[in-house]
C-alpha cells in the first residue's frame, strides 16, 4: 500500500480539475434528422410586409433602359422620388384613385383638346377596389407617373424625338423641354394637378388662338395644318422678352411687340417653297436701314447666269450691279457670259424701292 501525502493529494486534485476544464471530453456526432415530406408541412415563404411598395419597385426596375436622354432622365427622377417615400404610391390607395389621381388622369384623357394624342400616354385601366390587388395598384401608380412626365414632355415639343432627322432643316429651333424633376415635384405637391398640367402648355396668346381654331376645325383637313403651327409654338421660348419682333411668314408680315402688344408692322419678303425662309429664334443684335442685298451664290448660278446668257433682263428689272470680288464696279454688258463664270463676281442690289430686303433688315 502506497501512502500519498495530503498536500500532494490536494495538488493532484487541483491539477485534475484544471485539466478537466482545459480539455473537453470527446463528443459523439449526432445523426442527421431525416424528415418525411409526406408528413412534414412545407415552410411558408416570408410574408412581404409591403406588397404595394414591392410592386412599385418591380415596375420601376422593369422599365426600359434605352431611349432618349430625356426619357432616361425621367425614369431616374421617378426612381429617386419613389425611393424617397419608400416606394409608397402617389395617386392610388387600396380604395382606388385618390381625388388628385382622378383629376390628373381625367386631364390627361383630355390631351386631344390640346392637340396631343391621348393614346401616347398609355394610362392604365383602374379596376374596382375589390379587384385592385397590390400588384395592380403599384404597377398602375408608376404608369400614371410615367404618363404625367410624358405629357409634360409632349406639351413642350418633345414628341418629335429626332428633330434633326424628322424635320425640315429650315426649322432651326429646339424643343423647350421642362426639367422632369421640377415638373414631377410640383405636380405631386399640387392641390390641383389638372390645372398644373394645363399650365405646362405654351402661354403665348397665339398658341391659345390656334388651339381654339383647332377645336373648331377638329376632324377637318385644316386641323392638321393648325396642329403643325401649334407644334411650332411648343418650340418657341417661353419668354420672348419685353420687346420682340415676330415674323409671320405665311402672312408676309413682321410685327414689333412691346409688353405683349403689337406696336408696329411691316410687309416682309419670304422665301418660296424651294427656298424656304429659315424659322429661328435669336436675340436681335443689329438693325440695318436701307440695306444692300448681296445675291447668294445659288441664285447667281441657277437664275442670273442663264438670264445673262439670254438678255440680262433680270439685271435691268431689279437694278442689279456687278462687282469684282474686292468690290470694284463692273459693267455686266462688257462680259461674255457664255465663257465667264458668274461665281467669279459679286452681284449686289443697292438700297432703293426695288431692293428685296426692303427698307430695314
Residue ranges and their predicted role:
Residues 21-29:
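Boundary at the C-terminal end of the N-terminal hydrophobic targeting segment
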Residues 28-173:
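Cationic-aromatic interfacial patches
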Residues 31-72, 142, 146-150, 154, ...:
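Well-ordered beta-sheet/strand-loop patches within structured domains
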Amino acid at each position: 500500500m502506497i501512502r500519498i501525502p495530503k498536500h500532494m493529494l490536494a495538488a493532484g486534485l487541483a491539477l485534475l480539475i484544471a485539466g478537466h476544464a482545459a480539455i473537453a471530453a470527446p463528443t459523439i456526432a449526432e445523426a442527421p434528422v431525416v424528415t418525411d415530406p409526406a408528413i412534414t408541412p412545407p415552410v411558408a415563404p416570408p410574408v412581404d410586409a409591403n406588397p404595394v411598395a414591392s410592386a412599385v419597385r418591380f415596375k420601376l426596375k422593369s422599365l426600359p433602359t434605352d431611349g432618349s436622354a430625356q426619357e432616361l432622365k425621367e425614369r431616374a427622377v421617378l426612381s429617386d422620388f419613389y425611393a424617397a417615400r419608400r416606394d409608397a404610391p402617389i395617386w392610388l390607395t387600396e380604395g382606388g384613385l385618390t381625388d388628385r389621381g382622378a383629376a390628373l388622369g381625367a386631364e390627361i384623357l383630355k390631351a386631344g383638346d390640346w392637340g396631343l394624342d391621348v393614346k401616347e400616354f398609355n394610362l392604365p385601366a383602374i379596376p374596382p377596389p375589390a379587384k385592385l390587388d397590390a400588384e395592380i395598384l403599384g404597377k398602375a401608380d408608376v404608369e400614371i407617373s410615367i404618363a404625367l412626365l410624358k405629357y409634360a414632355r409632349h406639351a413642350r415639343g418633345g414628341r418629335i424625338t429626332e428633330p434633326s432627322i424628322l424635320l425640315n432643316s429650315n426649322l432651326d429651333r429646339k424643343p423647350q423641354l421642362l426639367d422632369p424633376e421640377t415638373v414631377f415635384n410640383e405636380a405631386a405637391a399640387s392641390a390641383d394637378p389638372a390645372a398644373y398640367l394645363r399650365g405646362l402648355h405654351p402661354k403665348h396668346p397665339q398658341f391659345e388662338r390656334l388651339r381654339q381654331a383647332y377645336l373648331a376645325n377638329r376632324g377637318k383637313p385644316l386641323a392638321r395644318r393648325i396642329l403643325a403651327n401649334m407644334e411650332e409654338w411648343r418650340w418657341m421660348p417661353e419668354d420672348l422678352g419685353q420687346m420682340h419682333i415676330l415674323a409671320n411668314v405665311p402672312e408676309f408680315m413682321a410685327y414689333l411687340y412691346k409688353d405683349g402688344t403689337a406696336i408696329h408692322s411691316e410687309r416682309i419678303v419670304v422665301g418660296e417653297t424651294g427656298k424656304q425662309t429659315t424659322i429661328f429664334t435669336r436675340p436681335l443684335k443689329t438693325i440695318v436701314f436701307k440695306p444692300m442685298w448681296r445675291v447668294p451664290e445659288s441664285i447667281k448660278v441657277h437664275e442670273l447666269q442663264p438670264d445673262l446668257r439670254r438678255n440680262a433682263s433680270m439685271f435691268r428689272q431689279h437694278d442689279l450691279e456687278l462687282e469684282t470680288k474686292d468690290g470694284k464696279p463692273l459693267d455686266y454688258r462688257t462680259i461674255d457670259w457664255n465663257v465667264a463664270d458668274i461665281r467669279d463676281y459679286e452681284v449686289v442690289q443697292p438700297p432703293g424701292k426695288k431692293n428685296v430686303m426692303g427698307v430695314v433688315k
